[in-house]
Amino acid sequence: MQIFVKTLTGKTITLEVESSDTIDNVKAKIQDKEGIPPDQQRLIFAGKQLEDGRTLADYNIQKESTLHLVLRLRGGAKKRKKKTYTKPKKIKHKHKKVKLAVLQFYKVDDSGKVQRLRKECPNTECGAGTFMANHFDRHYCGKCGKTYVYQKADA
């Protein structure tokens, strides 16, 4: 039977084959006519690439069918250089976990009453439970920035 092979240049080659011929045989015949080595050939029929070991009958290629010849592209993306850093990586801050950390904000006196050791921020933006930091001369809210400075006693 006769089949047609259309190349990239638009040229059509006619080949005399049998339906029992393998794709390898067809590629060898194309090499004889065009001089393109079989490892660079890709044959497409009905939108599918034809695999070397299979026969023309496997792909239902009949007389006067047209195969499309495409050349195989070798290689891939360009190799990239490995990035070199001038400074070493910054070590991430590790959060220290302290069990029952809230207990340091409260104290239970002898009568069983719970006393708050830290001053709570009165600002409405901060919300309930926002404690102010105790500094040697002031109380400071880290959320809103409100500061209360201790009064110095005149001696």
Curated annotation (Swiss-Prot):
There is a cross-link at residue 48 (Glycyl lysine isopeptide (Lys-Gly) (interchain with G-Cter in ubiquitin)). InterPro entries: Ribosomal_eS31, Ribosomal_eS31_euk-type_sf, Ribosomal_zn-bd, Ubiquitin-like_dom, Ubiquitin-like_domsf, Ubiquitin_CS, Ubiquitin_dom, Ubiquitin_ubiquitin-like. A zinc finger (C4-type) spans 121-144. GO terms for cellular component: cytoplasm; nucleus; ribonucleoprotein complex; ribosome. Residues 1-76 form the Ubiquitin-like domain. It comes from Lupinus albus (White lupine). One of its GO terms (biological process) is translation. This is Ubiquitin-ribosomal protein eS31 fusion protein. Pfam families: Ribosomal_S27 (PF01599), ubiquitin (PF00240). Keywords: Cytoplasm, Isopeptide bond, Metal-binding, Nucleus, Ribonucleoprotein, Ribosomal protein, Ubl conjugation, Zinc, Zinc-finger. Gene3D superfamilies: 6.20.50.150, Phosphatidylinositol 3-kinase Catalytic Subunit, Chain A, domain 1 (3.10.20.90).
